[in-house]
Regions:
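A solvent-exposed, charged loop/short amphipathic helix patch at secondary-structure junctions
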Residues: 67-78, 177-190, 259-268
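Conserved N-proximal alpha/beta basic substrate-recognition cap immediately N-terminal to
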Residues: 8-20, 24-135, 139-143
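Extreme N-terminal starter segment of soluble prokaryotic enzymes
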Residues: 1-4
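A long amphipathic alpha-helix within ATP-dependent nucleotide-binding catalytic cores
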Residues: 198-309
Length: 371
């Protein structure tokens, strides 16, 4: 077995996967840089087995994806829709040579569009927060919230990642409150590592209106379960249909992403709070979420238990959600687990099984958590 990785050569993701491949006794994978893909390099040929890694964290690649002559400034929220279009085009280029991709381009395209991902999960009966129809700006958002009877929502850029541009918005008799990592500067919007609160409605309205042209996905803000004084959710990595690795994310506010200064929680404590039956049901939901993207070796599922621990919902599914440094299961990290799935035949068996079952998940009634 000879693997190729499409990625940014100096990125730790490529390094961690390469280490896992070598530890399994396989040849060092070839690396095809994203920058080369986007500037016309020949794609991997038929017969190659290709892992496509995140194109993020590289200014040159970001500029190429956006088809821009100018680099984005650090943290700048710019060209999210253009970046998505560039990613979809880049994936098509990678696939053009007939190689077998471990991240199917159609799956990745759906996963990187929160609207399409939510619709696919809902249609398959996976519990997700209820969502509003397309929103063109703040006025439409407030009108849709009023019609739905919702006081709290998450406003998400359709093509954002890592909480970039996300706004947790609450409205009430005393006004509005928006919790977000967005820093508003005179010359643009910037994603920050510090969460901010905005309570001036004019400011909040302008923020939503500036993000809206990139495309927005708006979901009901569901009350999460908590441990101690923090709310919690989970990142669960599903490899070849099996939930193998999980990290608890604990926060004092609504945004739980670890890079925003939040802490890893205690998985054993969370499992004890949920109880065996609720935990098993949640893991089965992660399997069902992954089965919505059956041609992808792995996905990262963001799963939340709701207040009371008896119900749960999937907040997001991530195409490149396997970066969980230091988290081991059966002695393997997420990258070693993926290599094991390939060498053991589990990946091939799961793909065959999902092909058989794919007809069973079509045509089902959408499922959404409304409370």
């Amino acid at each position: 077995m000879r693997l190729t990785v499409v990625g940014n050569p100096d990125n730790r993701r490529v390094g961690l996967f390469t280490a896992a491949v070598l530890a399994a006794g396989l040849p060092r994978p070839a690396v095809l840089p994203w920058a080369d893909v986007l500037t016309g390099a020949a794609p991997p040929p038929a017969g190659a087995l290709v892992r496509v890694d995140s194109p993020g964290e590289d200014p040159q690649v970001d500029r190429l994806l956006r088809r821009s002559v100018a680099s984005a400034r650090h943290g700048e929220l710019i060209g999210l829709a253009d970046t998505y279009a560039g990613l979809v085009d880049g994936l098509a280029r990678v696939a053009a040579g007939g190689a077998e991709l471990l991240n199917d381009p159609a799956d990745v395209a759906a996963l990187c569009d929160k609207r399409r991902c939510h619709a696919r999960l809902s249609a398959a009966g996976v519990p997700v927060p209820a969502a509003l129809p397309s929103i063109g700006g703040y006025g439409e958002l407030r009108a849709a919230m009023a019609e739905a009877g919702w006081a709290r929502v998450f406003v998400k850029p359709a093509h954002g990642s890592s909480a970039a541009g996300v706004i947790a918005l609450a409205v009430g008799p005393r006004g509005v409150r928006a919790v977000t990592p967005i820093e508003i500067a005179p010359d643009g919007l910037f994603n920050s590592l510090r969460v901010r609160c905005y309570d001036d409605e004019t400011t909040v309205a302008a923020l939503v209106d500036r993000l809206a042209p990139e495309g927005l996905h708006v979901e009901r803000w569901l009350p999460k379960a908590g441990l101690g004084d923090r709310v919690v959710d989970l990142r669960v990595v599903v490899v070849a249909g099996q939930p193998t690795h999980a990290v608890v994310r604990a926060a004092t506010g609504p945004l739980t992403n670890l890079h925003l200064g939040n802490a890893r929680g205690d998985l054993a404590e969370l499992r004890a709070a949920a109880g065996p039956a609720a935990w098993a049901a949640a893991m089965q939901t992660c399997v069902r979420a992954a089965a919505c993207f059956p041609r992808s070796l792995h996905v990262g599922v963001d799963l939340m238990f709701l207040l009371g621990w008896r119900r749960h919902a999937v907040a997001e599914v991530n195409a490149f959600g396997d970066l969980l440094p230091g988290v081991l299961a059966d002695g393997r990290d997420t990258y070693a687990e993926q290599v094991h799935a390939l060498t053991s035949g589990r990946w091939q068996r799961w793909r065959a099984a999902t092909k058989v079952l794919s007809g069973a998940v079509t045509g089902r009634e959408p499922v959404a958590c409304g409370t």
